[in-house]
Design a protein with these regions (language model features):
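Post-Walker A helix-loop "phosphate-sensing" segment adjacent to the P-loop in P-loop NTPases
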Residues: 25-34
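NTP-dependent small-molecule kinase module
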Residues: 2, 22, 26, 75, ...
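A glycine- and Lys/Arg-enriched "phosphate-lid" helix/loop adjacent to the NTP-binding pocket
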Residues: 96-144
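Conserved beta-strand scaffold positions in the cores of enzyme catalytic domains, especially
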Residues: 31, 96-101, 151-153
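Structural motif
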Residues: 7, 77-79, 101
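Glycine-rich phosphate-binding P-loop
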Residues: 8-21
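Short amphipathic alpha-helical segments
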Residues: 20-21, 89-92, 112-115
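ATP-dependent small-molecule kinase phosphotransfer cores
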Residues: 36-93, 126
């Protein structure tokens, strides 16, 4: 296990940054916001990166930063977006450390309200269509993410 990395993620709308800040404060560790670090290095917003490079290109950048952080000498807490576990290589790095999933106690309605307030989302479905269409796309995403995170929790319990 890589004791240098505590990764916090969660479904779209989960309070990932808040949970990561809490853990960093409790453990006296620095906090790295993965999206902010990518934006700082690349110079473009996450939304622009995804538009220009596609999600695959963005996931490659996530992997590069996670790889550097995991091999660093200093432990840290990393706040990650809701899709970081979609990439097999990033997932492998995350599994070498500690994974915390934020917002498991929130209902879909609570996640939806939080997601609507996220002006920086790269999820295209939040920018187009009616409120009902956005909610339907959100519900579909949340069902898939919840299933993935449940699998991650079960896998963590087996360690």
């Amino acid at each position: 296990m890589n004791a240098n990395l505590i990764v916090v993620t969660g479904c779209f709308g989960a309070p990932v940054k808040e949970k990561a800040q809490e853990i960093a404060r409790q453990k006296g560790l620095p906090l790295v916001d993965l999206d902010s670090e990518i934006t700082k290095r690349d110079g473009r917003s996450i939304r622009r990166l995804v538009m220009m490079n596609g999600e695959h290109g963005y996931r490659n950048l996530e992997y590069e930063v996670l790889s550097e952080l995991s091999s660093g000498a200093s432990p840290c807490v990393v706040a990650c977006g809701d899709g970081v576990l979609y990439d097999d290589d990033s997932r492998e790095i995350i599994h070498s450390g500690e994974l915390v999933i934020a917002g498991t106690d929130l209902s879909e309605d609570e996640l939806w309200e939080n997601a609507k307030a996220d002006a920086d989302t790269y999820h295209a479905f939040m920018s187009f269509g009616t409120e009902e269409e956005k909610r339907a796309a959100f519900s579909d995403l949340i069902r898939r993410q919840c299933s993935m995170f449940e699998d991650e929790i079960l896998q963590g319990e087996k360690k």
